[in-house]
Amino acid sequence: MGIAKLGKQIKEHKVFVIVPIVILIVVVLARTFIWRDYTKEQIEMAIYLKDKYGGQEFVVGKPVREGAMLAIEGYLVAIAYPANNSKIKFRVIHSSSARYDGYAGAVWSDEESKRLEPEIYRLFGKGTDYTVEIKSALELQNAQVNFHGKIIALDDIAKIYGKQIPYGLAIKRLKKNLSDDEKEDIVNKLIELSASLPDKTDTAVTYISETSEKREYGLAVPLDNLRKLSNRQDKINLFSEWKVGGLQDYDLRQDGFN
């Protein structure tokens, strides 16, 4: 048998061995991460929420696996909401070692959004687009509820954990090419609004005046720094551009905001 023919047979043999292995790996991964039925975990999430929040019923969506790789199990994530209020949606996380959820933050966000609405509409106009997002560090998960499964009021838990609770207010009023006078007026209104914002939490304010698929324009500033502003040029200089999705990493902790 010639060397060339032998080499060809060896290559063909390798192909016959490798291809089935690759197919097997793809099937296993697909069954694990795509086709697997997570009904059992979905039910467990609903039971976990009901037990944690004093018998309250929740609707839990279909879990999906995130953060999984060949050697990493990852975790399951589902969107849930109270059975009597589908507007308060939050994430539930389920892993082999722990379960936690964002229900408290969703409730606080909803309450704060309703509380701030009259003041925001007064300053920026009725129908102004805004969101309030409040989260809490994972170590606060058990501290968010009392012994009866009731969520502790934001003011009360902020007295204990303070800056460990991120509080974000974002206002969007689209208008291109703002003049310096308009920028100053916006900041002045935000300063007036800041009197209604909690100062014990890690509070930050965002204002968006221009947006595109990749970039946004406006300002993002911690509450304490917003309240200190008095110079006209400092107010104007707050406005800049940032990449969409990078707002949390926007320069809130630099340029004097350390």
Predicted feature descriptions by range:
Residues R31-P63, L116-G125, I186-I191:
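Short, non-transmembrane alpha-helical segments in secretory-pathway proteins
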Residues Y103-V187:
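Non-cytosolic head/periplasmic domains of membrane-anchored proteins
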